Amino acid sequence: VPPEGYWDRVQEICRKHDILLHIDEVVCGVGRTGTWFGYQHWGVKPDFVTMAKGVASGYAAIACTVTTEAVFEMFKDDAADPMGYFRDISTFGGCASGPAAALENMRIIEDEALLDNTSRMGARLVANLEALAERHRVIG
């Protein structure tokens, strides 16, 4: 867990120097921290987010990058074909099983309230780790 104010400062520096803020959610994304994405715990507004395994819970190959409209506009190089730049940059492009698995995975996460369960289990884990740290000075 980053120190308090860390992400605010990172975001401030990026905005000040016109640097795009990329958040890699391959490990923390898609419900693994009690929110859809780990960065949501700190109110960060990234310019683009990458995610992979968790999108389909490992049942199908899928990875994706999600971005803002402003970043998307930067990549357009042909007004007649606004998707031209993005057409051939996908490892799993054209494979429908990944997106199908992702949609079903997200439906299950919502239907079974797994974000809430993750939050409860996370709080339980933290409480138990804190109890261990109190008993063993080498922890922490």
Residue ranges and their predicted role:
Residues 1-140:
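Conserved N-terminal phosphate-binding loop of PLP-dependent enzymes in the Aspartate aminotransferase
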